[in-house]
């Protein structure tokens, strides 16, 4: 009964944890590393073919983005998640695969001229489609038997439609334990979705800490504040450019803008045009407009009953092709442009930034968390120039951090969430927080009477004995290109070592001659590089 940590350990992306019990291995999430957190997404610290079950907390790419790689490299087990997470995950993984293929094509065009080796995409659209051969779904509060000695219950985490905290009941060799994986804990009073449902009992808790060191700014009215920004900017003849996550945050923005238009809060340009420049956002919005029984909050349910279309309003335009996207920047009409990616590291948003950052009458409004190392974070931190598509762009636009609009619980609500457990858990593993946040939040939990620590990469913990098996290490994250290369090589070494260990475990029962030969080669290799 062991718990392994393979991602989002003292960082906020790449969530991946593995439970080992009764000869089975159960993975919880398999996310993409992003921004400064990235080591090397190609290398998994375990053998995919040895994973029996994958549980998915929600559809965001930092929790799902390496599932196609998992399947591509040999996973053929069961994938379990909620119905709406499965719907959103299909859209997001296909979009992610398209980005992977496009990025590889771009690198190969450049690399061919420079004589570099061919680069394969991390995975393809077909790899993403293959994931859904293994997906099964459940609803909230439904108890699902996973394998001998393990059952799962998904509870609404209030972070995104379909998002869940997952509680596992465990039994091995007569030992009974319960472990809860928080997933991403949602903020309260968000439009559309319900507040996070509190959990009551667990021996162990794996808990996120994204905002473990701060509270959200109190906002009197999201609608009024956004209307003020739009009114001021459009009145000056500029554009409001909003980098946004295509799934969840874009739909919230549409919800607010519908209210703004209904209440006629923008005086300078009452019928202002809004462009959703993200095919992914368009596809996701169709899910948000579908069968949401069991997922919506009460206010949203009332709107649906009244026949209100929550995400549509006059002069809303959905941009399809890249040609249409480019034409937006040729049109001088003041407008609102909502585009992905939310952290500005990829996607069409980068073109809109190129054409608007230098304009003093435009505004760039950040409505999403910006990870360290991303372009979005650099803009929020006040950088004066950025390079986009090989061109240096001056930052003269108004940069607005639309605080308070977050799908993550803040510090006080995280504390409230963990305090709901009665009795206190035996141990709390703090994950999904920056290197300077997760340990501090863990220490605060200790001061509140919990036993907690911030988990490290490759850490292993024996849940039956309540003791650390191996401590793991703090990965060196991406800082510079040179540093990143060193990190990637080290990650490959660790991944190779993990694969070797998995292979060695499967050698039980082989002829003694083979085992002896392999042992000799491993020892020889270690001795060769020991110095």
Q: What is each stretch, according to the model?
A:
Residues 229-374, 386-387, 422, 437-439, ...:
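Hard-cation-handling environments
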Residues 100-105, 292-305, 469-494:
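A polyampholytic, Gly/Pro-enriched intrinsically disordered region
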Residues 191-206, 292-299, 370-396:
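Short, compositionally biased "basic patch" segments
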Residues 185, 218-223, 312-324, 343-345, ...:
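A general structural motif
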Residues 150-154, 287-295, 415-417, 465-475:
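Short, surface-exposed amphipathic charged segments that create phosphate/polyanion-binding patches used
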């Amino acid at each position: 009964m062991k718990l392994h940590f393979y991602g989002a350990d003292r960082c906020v992306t790449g969530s991946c944890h593995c439970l080992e019990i009764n000869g089975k291995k159960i993975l919880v999430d398999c996310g993409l590393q992003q921004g400064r957190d990235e080591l090397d997404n190609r290398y998994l610290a375990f053998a995919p073919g040895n994973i029996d079950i994958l549980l998915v907390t929600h559809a965001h790419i930092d929790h799902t983005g390496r599932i196609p790689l998992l399947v591509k490299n040999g996973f053929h087990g069961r994938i379990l998640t909620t119905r709406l997470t499965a719907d959103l995950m299909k859209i997001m993984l296909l979009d992610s695969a398209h980005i992977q293929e496009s990025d590889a094509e771009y690198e190969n065009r450049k690399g061919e001229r420079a004589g570099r080796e061919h680069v394969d995409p991390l995975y393809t659209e077909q790899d993403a489609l293959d994931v859904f051969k293994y997906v099964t779904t459940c609803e909230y509060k439904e108890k699902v038997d996973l394998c001998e000695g393990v059952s799962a219950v998904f509870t609404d985490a209030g972070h995104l439609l379909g998002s869940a905290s997952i509680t596992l009941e465990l039994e091995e060799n007569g030992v009974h334990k319960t472990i809860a994986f928080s997933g991403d804990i949602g903020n309260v009073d968000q439009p559309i979705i319900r507040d996070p449902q509190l959990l009551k009992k667990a021996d162990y808790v794996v808990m996120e800490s994204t905002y473990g060191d701060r509270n959200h700014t109190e906002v009197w009215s999201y609608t009024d504040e956004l209307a003020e920004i739009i009114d001021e900017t459009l009145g000056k003849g500029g554009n409001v450019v909003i980098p946004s996550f295509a799934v969840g945050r874009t739909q919230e923005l549409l919800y607010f803008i519908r209210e703004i238009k209904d209440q006629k809060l923008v005086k300078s340009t009452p019928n202002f045009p809004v462009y959703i420049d993200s095919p992914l956002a368009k596809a996701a919005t169709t899910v948000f407009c579908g069968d949401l029984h069991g997922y919506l909050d009460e206010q949203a349910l009332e709107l649906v009953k009244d026949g209100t279309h929550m995400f549509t309003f006059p002069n809303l335009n959905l941009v399809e092709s890249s040609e249409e996207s480019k034409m937006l920047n040729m049109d001088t009409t003041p407008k609102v442009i909502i585009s992905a990616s939310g952290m500005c590291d990829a996607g069409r948003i980068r073109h809109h930034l190129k054409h608007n950052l230098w304009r003093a009458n435009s505004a760039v409004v950040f409505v999403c968390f910006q990870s360290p190392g991303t372009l979005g974070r650099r803009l929020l931190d006040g950088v004066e120039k950025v390079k986009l598509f090989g061109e240096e762009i001056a930052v003269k636009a108004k940069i607005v951090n639309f605080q308070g609009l977050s799908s993550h619980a803040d510090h006080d609500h995280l504390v409230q969430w963990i305090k709901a457990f009665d009795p206190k858990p035996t141990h709390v593993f703090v994950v999904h927080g920056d290197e300077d946040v997760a340990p501090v939040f863990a220490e605060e939990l200790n001061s509140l009477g919990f036993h907690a620590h911030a988990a490290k990469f490759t850490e292993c913990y024996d849940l039956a004995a309540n003791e650390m098996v191996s401590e793991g290490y703090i990965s060196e994250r991406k800082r510079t290109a040179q540093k990143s290369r060193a990190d990637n090589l080290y990650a490959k070494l660790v991944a190779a070592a993990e694969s070797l260990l998995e292979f060695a475990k499967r050698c039980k029962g082989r002829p003694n001659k083979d085992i002896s030969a392999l042992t000799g080669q491993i020892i020889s290799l270690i001795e060769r590089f020991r110095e």
